[in-house]
C-alpha cells in the first residue's frame, strides 16, 4: 500500500499550510465553535490512509468517512461493512495524526430497524457522533428511535434536483416535531446546482443545521446537449453543471453563508467535499483552508 509522508504531502500542497499561524484558526474558528474537516470522498482516488495523511498535511484535525472506503488505492468497501481489523486500522491511523473522525455518509438508513441499527452500531464503534443520510420518509420513525437510543445525530443530506431532499423545505418537513438529534447536512454546492440561494436555504434551516458539506462553485463551460437515443429529444438536466473552486472565488457567496451561520449561533463542522481536479486538488483545498481561517478570524472579531 502506497503511503505518503506528511512532508511529502505538504510539499505537494505548494503553500505552507503546516506553517500557518495556528493562533489564527484557534482564535477564530474555535471562538465561533466551528471545525473544518475533510470528507474522505474528496480523495476518493487515493486510499483512506493517504486521505488521512493529506488531511494532516493541510493542518486539519477532523475528517469524515464517505459511504465507501478505499483501502488500498484501488478497491473500495462499503464503510459500515469494514472488518474489525480494517476499521481499527483506520481509527489508529487517524489518531496517530491527531485527527478525529466526525461523521460518516452518505449512508443508507432503511425502515428495517435491524439494518439501520447496524449503521448506528458501526458509528458507535468508530466513536463517531453523526451519520449523514437521506432516509426515505418511511424510515424516519425508525431513525428517530435509534438516534435517541444511541445518542447519535442524523443529518439529512441534500443532493441536487430531482433527489427527494434537494429543497430545504423537505428536510424541515422530515424533522418537524422530532428530536433535535435529527437535522440537516447542508450541502451548499448542491443547493447552487438546484438553482437555490444557499444563504436563504440556511436561514430556512436555522436551528436544524447539524453539519455542512461546504462548497464554492462556478458553472462548467457550456456544452452541446446530448440526445436521448430512444426519443431523439434533447436531454435537459434538472440541475446545473457546476464544479468546485477555492472558497471565496466562486458564485456561492460563501462569506455571507458563514456570516449567516454565525448569526444563527451554529456550532459544528464545515466539511470539505471537493469534487474537482481529483488527482491534484490539494493546492486548491489549501486555499479553502486559508480562506476559512481568515474569514473565521474576521467574523470572530465582529459582534
In which residue ranges do the predicted regions lie?
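Bacterial N-terminal signal peptides that target proteins for export
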Residues: 1-8
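Histidine-acidic metal/acid-base catalytic patches
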Residues: 2, 20-40, 46-62, 172-183, ...
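Hydrophobic h-region of N-terminal signal peptides that target proteins for export
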Residues: 10-18
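Active-site-proximal loop/turn and secondary-structure-junction residues that shape catalytic pockets
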Residues: 42-44, 67-69, 107-110, 136-139, ...
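Conserved beta-strand positions in the central sheet of alpha/beta enzyme cores
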Residues: 64, 103, 132, 155-156, ...
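Glycine-rich, proline-tolerant flexible connector loops at the mouths of alpha/beta enzymes
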Residues: 64-89
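Short, charged, surface-exposed secondary-structure boundary motifs
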Residues: 73-74, 164-167, 222
